[in-house]
Amino acid sequence: MNIYFRRIINAVIASAFTCYFGVYSLVGGVNKQPPEVPEDFTPVLRFAVCSDVHLSGEEDQANAKRFTALYNDTYDYAATQSYKGFDAVIVAGDMTGGGREPEYVMFKKIIDENCREGTRTLVCMGNHEFIEYRDYDATIGYDVYKKFVSEDVDTHTVINGYHFIGVSYADDGKTFKSKVEWLKAELDKAVADTPDKPIFVFQHPHPTLTVYGSVNWSDLDIKTTLMKYPQVVDFSGHSHYASCDPRSINQTSFTSVGTGSLGALMSNLDYISGDVDMPGETAAFWLAEVDAEGNLLLKLYDAVSHRFFDDVQYYIPNVANKGTKYYSWGNLRSIDTAPQFPQDAKVSVSTDSEGETVLNFPNAKGYFDAENYRITVKSGAKTVWSDTVVSNYGRADLTEMAVNVGKLDKGEYTVTIAPYSPYSKGG
């Protein structure tokens, strides 16, 4: 398919997505402030969730170091808490770059050297686990996975009374249709056991039309299956789309959470110009904590700066309650506000080693951090540079933007910077 034509289709779907959630999300209500975490919230379960590690097999690869840090940083965090358990790590697919044996060797090595007693590592297969073999026999992907990880490509595990269900692609590395009946059966077992508690499901692609990235990196069979189970909290990757973005959580008939990537987070500003890497190094994973009543706390961890994001935290009480949708697309959009710069904000100008001009300015923030900035540089009435750039909201430690606008002749210029939120509020 022609790439331009595909982008047009994605843009049309994105528009339909916006209309769909603009109506559907009203069912859960709007203008509802998400609840604060109760002071007496006491976890009985703690687990980390990541995806898209894309190990190359090289020990000094940044992704390998981040996957290692996921274990060690979480153990360090748990040691400071009243509940000190670190019960599980979920890897929602694409732990390898292409499903090659040296990549699995590195995956297993990191787990063997860093995963301590009492922590389970739960894994499902992503599309990259089949890439090396697709041209002649994709089913080999299963054989290699079973050799290094587990004989079971689909799993149902109970940890501290909570159900975890992991679903891999079929052996073609592309579809889930053949997995639907198994998934339904396992969900029914989990609901029969714990009808009023969250059931954690993970697979590689997003359920279609749920979270950020689910327009063009998704699977419809997964979506239609999960719709019947309000207890489900689903974790998915594939798109690499920024997990720090509020659109990466969405409550409809079930709860969906996008996992971003331990490689590089990505963004897509309009579904026409295509996916873009976020500026600089970016990587993140979720830390989930659950109490005895089934209330869930999600906190996002920056795997590059080794710290939690200050404002990316979601407390979800009564997950199975169909009427409680604080994190629906419609509600989050309704409480969003246009980002503003600090009152004393200024733009400073510097020159890089190539002689190109760099604009430096502080981050803008509304209810959520700015997602992008629309920047125009003018010489008199003439526009000499104009672009929309992704913000650095994919990093927990950065407070200032640095935007290269190329080589400019000496003279006076007028710079206009308009920040926009993830829900396109601003200007």
Each predicted region: which residue ranges?
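Gram-positive cell-envelope targeting signals
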Residues: 1-30
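N-terminal active-site segment of His-dependent metallophosphoesterases
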Residues: 24-102
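Active-site neighborhood of phospho(di)ester-bond hydrolases with catalytic His/Asp-centered motifs
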Residues: 49-51, 87-94, 120-127, 200-204, ...
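Extended active-site neighborhood of metal-dependent phosphoesterases/phosphodiesterases
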Residues: 100-188, 193-194, 221-228, 244-279, ...
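Short acidic, glycine-rich surface-loop motifs adjacent to enzyme active sites
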Residues: 190-212
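Binuclear metal-dependent phosphoesterase catalytic core
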Residues: 247-343
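Conserved aromatic anchor
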Residues: 355-368
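Beta-strand-rich modules
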Residues: 407-425
